[in-house]
A protein has these predicted regions:
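Short glycine/serine/threonine-rich phosphate/pyrophosphate-binding segments
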Residues: 3, 53-59, 177-182
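Proline-centered loop/turn at the N-terminus of a beta-strand
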Residues: 66-70
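A residue-level signal for conserved active-site and pocket-lining positions in enzyme catalytic cores
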Residues: 47, 73, 136, 236
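ATP/nucleoside-binding phosphotransfer catalytic cores, i.e., glycine-rich phosphate-binding loops
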Residues: 118, 125, 138, 155-159, ...
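ATP/NTP phosphate-donor binding region
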Residues: 1-49, 61, 85-104, 115-130
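Catalytic core of DAGKc-family lipid kinases
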Residues: 75-166
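Gly/Ser/Thr-rich active-site loops/lids in small-molecule metabolic enzymes
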Residues: 159-206
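Glycine-rich beta-strand-to-loop/alpha-helix junction loops that act as flexible
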Residues: 49-52, 173-174
């Protein structure tokens, strides 16, 4: 279905004189490096058909280039980050709106993570940076048994806590409605810049989520069995291994994801109600004071 939508839109845009690059995106397909390397002029817009996972993949690759994304929910489940397919029913009208600048651009903060060896005197990273729009997850990795992770967390160089459990989530406000809310973290409005730390199934009841200002640097040290690695995940995609003696530093990225919003009546709170199926109280009361 996504391919059918893409082919239809590509034909229409080419008829309007646009140059269109088209390719599949999924767990085994990553067209973005080829797209970015094959163009001689800046890309004006990326149109992505799929679910939130498809939009997240596009964001990680396109945010460094400043390319805005029009994400359309085709076959997805939640659709927190996407426009509804109903908004694209009259595609010709959509192209005219884009040409006439009749849309909004929503900017979402991102996180970046890097691996370092040893203490803070070593400022040279061992890895490239890994971008995340939703969250960075630090979790134990073992192919044959479920192990408890022991993670020490620093904030701005100060040790805050040691967590024993299934791992640690470091998320953006955008990601607060994903893995983070499932792990008991707070929902943060995406108009804010903040970093949310949420333990995953901690063994201590006193280990609670923390909301940090955007300038904070979160460092996580694995303290488990030296023969076992810990894994770094970004938006559910495996990034790299973290071994004892190494740390991962997570901070706000200089890049931001730009989403095209077509809905003129867009409401974040309406999205929360619909996607999270908030039903309110069992008894419904009438507010006669509202005009």
């Amino acid at each position: 279905l996504s391919q059918q939508w893409a082919e239809k839109c590509a034909r229409q845009l080419e008829a309007l004189g646009s140059r269109v690059l088209q390719g599949p995106s999924g767990p085994k397909d990553n067209p973005y490096p080829v797209f970015l390397a094959s163009v001689s002029q800046p890309i004006d817009l990326a149109i992505v058909f799929g679910g939130d996972g498809t939009a997240l993949t596009a964001a990680r690759h396109l945010a460094p280039e400043g390319i805005p994304i029009l994400a359309v929910n085709v076959g997805g489940h939640l659709g927190f980050l996407t426009e509804t397919s109903e908004e694209m029913e009259d595609t010709e009208a959509v192209w005219q709106r884009l040409l006439n600048d009749r849309f909004a651009v929503q900017r979402r903060m991102m996180l970046q993570a890097q691996i370092f060896q040893g203490n803070r005197t070593n400022r040279e990273p061992m890895s490239e940076y890994f971008l995340a729009l939703n969250e960075v997850a630090v979790k134990p990795a073992s192919p044959d048994r479920m192990i408890t992770s022991i993670l020490e967390m620093e904030i701005d160089g100060e040790v805050v806590d040691q967590y024993q459990g299934d791992g640690l989530l470091i998320s953006t406000p955008t990601g607060s409605t994903g893995y983070t809310v499932a792990a008991g973290g707070p929902i943060i409005h995406p108009g804010m810049d903040a970093i949310v730390i949420t333990p995953i199934c901690p063994l201590s009841l006193s280990s609670r989520p923390i909301v940090l200002p955007p300038g904070s640097v979160v460092s996580v040290w694995p303290l488990a069995d030296p023969d076992l690695s810990t894994k770094l995940w970004t938006d559910g995609v495996l990034g790299t291994a973290i071994w004892p003696g190494q740390r991962v530093d997570v901070r706000i990225s200089d890049y931001m994801t730009k989403f095209i919003i077509l809905r003129e009546n867009y409401s974040y709170y309406g999205t929360l109600r619909n996607k999270l199926h908030w039903a309110g109280a069992r008894l419904s009361f009438t507010n006669n004071n509202r005009n």
